[in-house]
A protein has these predicted regions:
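PLP-dependent enzyme catalytic core of the Aspartate aminotransferase-like
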Residues: 5, 32, 179, 245-246, ...
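Short glycine-enriched loop/turn motifs at secondary-structure junctions
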Residues: 100, 223-225, 284-287
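Short hydrophobic/aromatic beta-strand micro-patches
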Residues: 108, 230-232, 292-294
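Short, solvent-exposed polar/charged micro-motifs at secondary-structure junctions
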Residues: 26-28, 212-217, 262-267
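Flexible loop/turn segments at secondary-structure boundaries
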Residues: 76, 97, 211-213, 238, ...
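Conserved PLP-enzyme active-site core in the AAT-like
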Residues: 1-196, 204
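Short, glycine-/Ser/Thr-/acidic-enriched flexible segments
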Residues: 112-113, 174, 210, 234-236, ...
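Conserved small-domain helix->loop->beta segment predominantly found in fold-type I
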Residues: 157-160, 165-166, 171, 175, ...
């Protein structure tokens, strides 16, 4: 959020923030300077789900690509390219690595977007004088975008993993499906438990039938809406903090999608740099708690939450 709102504008790159579910608002925000639409499969921390097919339709009508952050969706739960997405990005630190040991990212190009026909991306069409006058669309074809990322951006920005971090992420990838299956199984059990707890006023988890995103979850994420979600406790920020401090198995850490279960207070940690207005716009409330459900025994995690909720 801060990258798009604060940092990139210093370099002349601006972003129009819109409601991902308001298609008229998205259409109205697109200008002749718009280069792409970007959204998350699952928003953080509310777990709202983007309608990928509709977003792809809008993007392609305007000859721009749809870029989706599928970090929470994971390649196991959702193949975004099946729904018209052009480029997928992931924080590999999360489910792909799986153990919170490395910082890294992934860009995956579907190869389906026609950069030349779009007319908005001369850097991929015209000869690149820094690389033997190669034309990425002419000489590379479907892999034009990802090749340009590797030969230009990787070379010029130095955003390269060390061999050891690459090894850790590749090792994590080997067990991705097995781990995510357990993550989701645990998350569903815990979300159902919390939804029926008298001291919990709200659970934001799209796999719950009560969620406004349930239908989209059934369409795009039938295996489960990941394992990161938020819930609100009865009371104030003080009550939320007391619950967090009383947990024994959950670690009070700001990362997510780790093998171990994690918990944070979003309003004062992950989103603590945001203004009150921005927090409200994102649906982040003082009494809200975010959990990232790990691979432990689900009954142990439920018991940990039960005891912590008794403290308020």
């Amino acid at each position: 959020f801060n990258l798009l709102k604060e940092t990139l504008p210093r370099y002349g790159i601006t972003t129009s923030f819109v409601d991902v579910a308001n298609f008229a608002e998205i259409e109205a925000a697109i200008t002749d300077k718009t280069k792409f639409i970007i959204a998350e499969t699952l928003g953080n921390p509310l777990g709202n789900i983007a309608d990928l097919e509709k977003l792809a339709e809008i993007a392609h009508q305007h000859a721009i690509p749809l870029v989706i952050d599928n970090t929470f969706g994971t390649p196991y739960l959702l193949n975004v390219f099946s729904y018209g997405v052009d480029i997928a990005v992931h924080s590999a630190t999360k489910f792909i690595g799986g153990h919170g040991t490395s910082i890294g990212g992934v860009i995956v190009d579907s190869g389906n977007f026609d950069w030349e026909k779009s007319g908005k991306f001369p850097q991929f069409v015209e000869p690149d004088p820094s690389y033997h006058d190669i034309s990425y669309t002419r000489d590379i074809g479907k892999a034009a975008f990802v090749t340009a990322v590797r030969t230009q951006l990787l070379r010029d920005t130095g955003a390269c993993l060390s061999p050891f971090n690459a090894f850790l992420l590749l090792q994590g990838l080997e067990t991705l499906s097995l781990r995510v299956e357990r993550h989701v199984e645990n998350a569903k059990k815990i979300a159902y438990y919390l939804e029926n707890h008298p001291k919990v006023t709200k659970v934001n988890y799209a796999s719950l039938p009560s969620s406004p995103y349930y239908d989209l979850a059934q369409k795009y994420l039938p295996k489960g809406a990941s394992s990161i979600f938020t819930f609100n406790v009865a009371g104030s920020a003080k009550a939320a903090r007391e619950v967090i401090d009383s947990l024994e198995i959950f670690s009070d850490l700001a990362n997510v999608a780790d093998a171990k279960s994690l918990v944070v207070h979003p309003a004062t940690t992950t989103h603590g740099q945001m203004t009150e207005e921005d927090l409200r716009a994102c649906g982040i409330e003082p009494e809200q708690i975010r959990v990232s459900i790990g691979l432990e025994n689900a009954d142990d995690l439920i018991e940990d939450l039960r005891l912590a909720l008794e403290k308020i």
